[in-house]
Amino acid sequence: MAKGQSLQDPFLNALRRERIPVSIYLVNGIKLQGQIESFDQFVILLKNTVNQMVYKHAISTVVPARPVSHHSGERGSDRPSEKSED
């Protein structure tokens, strides 16, 4: 798994597993809504009244309808390094 996906995959998996409704905003401004049925390295399958395959490179933002409890299982890649001078 690529280092850049260590946060993305657990987040999307929590949305899928808990069937949390999401709004997905595309880079062209279009808003899609539904539930994440599945995803891989390149696409997200979004389910609503129809299934839509959305390419990740076209996505700007994923907004859950409610808070998500996800645990990455990775070492805190979102935390500052120990050498940071705060």
Swiss-Prot record:
User: Which top-level group of life is the source organism from?
Assistant: Bacteria
List the PROSITE patterns hit by this protein, alphabetically.
Answer: SM
Using the UniProt annotation, give all residue ranges assigned to the region (Disordered).
65-86
Its GO biological process annotations read: regulation of DNA-templated transcription; regulation of RNA stability; regulation of translation, ncRNA-mediated
UniProt keywords (A-Z) are: RNA-binding, Stress response
- Indicate, by first and last residue, each region the UniProt record lists as having compositional bias (Basic and acidic residues): 71-86
Q: Which GO MF term does the entry hold, naming one?
A: RNA binding
Subunit = Homohexamer.
- Report the function annotation for this chain: RNA chaperone that binds small regulatory RNA (sRNAs) and mRNAs to facilitate mRNA translational regulation in response to envelope stress, environmental stress and changes in metabolite concentrations. Also binds with high specificity to tRNAs.
Protein name (database record): RNA-binding protein Hfq
Q: State the species of origin.
A: Vibrio vulnificus (strain YJ016)
Higher taxonomy: Bacteria, Pseudomonadati, Pseudomonadota, Gammaproteobacteria, Vibrionales
